[in-house]
């Protein structure tokens, strides 16, 4: 077993062990020199693989082992006492075992090569020339590396010109930094040459040609996108939204017209129940349904403020006062004149909404309804501007001068004279105290609330 172990060991390793365990003062230095020599040999062998004279040390290793077994055994006795030395020896063993493995590979390749004497091999390997060549190679590599690394470092740090890769600076050829990409350019290297004014002006922010192009493209792109979606928003959105927006408006208009007709039917019942609303309305009465629709819409849209005006307009004696021309009230004579159609009239009226009547043959209806309004008119107060029959001229237009309100009477003068005479006779009986004004206001408020609720319900539907 000892023989097999000895065959695997390297003579250099045995030398190193001898130096390690020796008590001489020079042993450390000798060990160091041996290490340097072995390293030099390893480098030399890697550079010159043609010299395949590795087998002689393999043969001579058996001889050297037999010679050096005695000092090894003698030196191994004191090694047991020092643990630190053993640890160091193990390290050296590991290093040395790696080297012989490489040498064994070379030995298998170079068996046929002619053998050289053992003494020449360590001399050639440990020659100082090989050490010098390795140093020269290392120095050359370092110098080239330093040169390249300096250039690369300058480029990485952005200290050199991007075009010519140099850091030289002259008076008219200074390095200028782009504020966008932070690359350095010589004034001459940059394609549109940079002027001294641009370099020396501290207020100027300089951009290279590439960055200026990119910034222009970006600016154009940012300008274009809002223009492109803008027409789509304008064209698409209204097409979707317009029918939705416009349809409810048209519906609302239709509903208001229909509501107007419905309100005309509702109002006579409110008049009969005593909840009369005082409304002053300006109307150009025409023949047919359109006149009635316009009349009813305007009566329904009049506010309670007109009622207050009419109620305050009467005198303390109970005589009705003249209504202002701007209010242009409509009264019972309007119903009579509207039956014949074609004569627009501005007429004095009572405050009651009795003229709003279901659509039927008008002249007989007006007579019947005037009687109805006369019977119910006890609840109504402050009838303003009722015309008197005394100044009525049949067939011609005349002023009903009872209270200064003008009324144009058509060919049906006899009917209007009858209705006005009946209503004027009823005014004296219908005038009451101020408490009825409050009831009128309350009735107005109720009516408006009812109208609003009805309109809201129809809108929801």
Swiss-Prot record:
The gene is Ints12. Component of the Integrator complex, composed of core subunits INTS1, INTS2, INTS3, INTS4, INTS5, INTS6, INTS7, INTS8, INTS9/RC74, INTS10, INTS11/CPSF3L, INTS12, INTS13, INTS14 and INTS15. The core complex associates with protein phosphatase 2A subunits PPP2CA and PPP2R1A, to form the Integrator-PP2A (INTAC) complex. PROSITE patterns: ZF_PHD_1, ZF_PHD_2. Residues 346-357, 387-436 have a biased composition (Low complexity). This is Integrator complex subunit 12. The keyword Zinc-finger applies. PANTHER family: INTEGRATOR COMPLEX SUBUNIT 12, NUCLEAR FACTOR-RELATED. A zinc finger (PHD-type) spans 158-214. The modification Phosphoserine is found at residue 127. Its main location: nucleus. There is a cross-link at residues 68, 253 (Glycyl lysine isopeptide (Lys-Gly) (interchain with G-Cter in SUMO2)). One of its GO terms (molecular function) is zinc ion binding. Dephosphorylated at Ser-127 by the PNUTS-PP1 complex, promoting RNA polymerase II transcription pause-release. Keywords: Isopeptide bond, Metal-binding, Nucleus, Phosphoprotein, Ubl conjugation, Zinc, Zinc-finger. One of its GO terms (cellular component) is nucleus. It is found in: Nucleus. Residues 88-124 have a biased composition (Basic and acidic residues). It comes from Rattus norvegicus (Rat). One of its GO terms (biological process) is snRNA processing. Belongs to the Integrator subunit 12 family. Component of the integrator complex, a multiprotein complex that terminates RNA polymerase II (Pol II) transcription in the promoter-proximal region of genes. Residues 45-129, 300-371, 387-444 are annotated as: Disordered. It comes from the Eukaryota. Residues 300-327 have a biased composition (Polar residues).
